Amino acid sequence: MDFSAYQNLWVFIETDDGKAASVGLELLHPGVELAHQLGQKAVAVILGKDNTEAEKAAIAYGADQVISVEDPAYEYYNTEAYTYGMTKLVEKYQPSILMIGATIIGRDFGPRLSCRLKTGLTADCTSLAVDAETGIMGWTRPAFGGNLMATIMCENTRPQMGTVRPGVFKKTAPDNTRTAEVIKESIPVPADVIRTTLIESIREAAAEMVKLEDAEIIVSGGRGLGKAENFSYIRDLADALGGAVGASRAAVDAGWIPHVHQVGQTGKTVAPKLYIACGISGAIQHQAGMSGSDCIVAINKDPDAPIFSIADYGIVGDLFQVLPVMTAEVKKLKS
């Protein structure tokens, strides 16, 4: 089939209160590289009520062009409204590739949009590659419970769509001196399209929010903790450091901590400045979710644990003795 009319790589920039969410800016990093390999543009696409800040951020993080749709209907994410607006844009501009963050919103938006466009979608990707000759994208994602990595291609329809996990790619350093074309589109949403309405938005208390993808410090616990109650050791150190609490799949499968804390191929992919792995053996599935961390500290009583092979610093010892000392020292330094 001839897809020569389909050009450019689009990155959907999710917003919150008019500000660009981190995942969209992360995706501009590979998006720009892949688009330029094809000799095409990396286009940031934004739907919202007031996109001024998000437009500036997208340009600073590398977008060659921005398509911005502003309307009160897009102030908050709405499945029907966003699908309607993006469908109109895709039909008009015909992008070859469309990348969406695999957030709660992206996991709802991506499948519905791909269905509307009658094209394929690869979900929860952790790696991307493109064939410069054919323009075909290779979307790689975990399969069979994270035991295999599958690369999926969409050869017969366009656009090629995929959702990509937050934290897989790091944002480039922003360049606030960059300029790029901003195309303003007006796409009002017909009343009969909207079947659901946001009545009230309630934000969780900051202390209860788990933002592993945005955390600069993560303290994670694994099977070595032995039971749910022992996650208090992890929380104490995380609180002292001002970090977030993570966990291995083994700890989550044991029911010691909710899945939202899981790091790894079947959990979240993170890249904090500091990652402390406590009682985690370091299976390849876990490493895939945190190996991009700037500094990795491993604490395990088994000197042959695989986690030590990727750790910058290793402590061979009993975590129940090590963690209280670390927590006390951190508190002492802070005081």
Locate each region found by the language model:
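N-terminal glycine-rich FAD/FM-binding segment characteristic of electron-transfer flavoproteins
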Residues: M1-S335
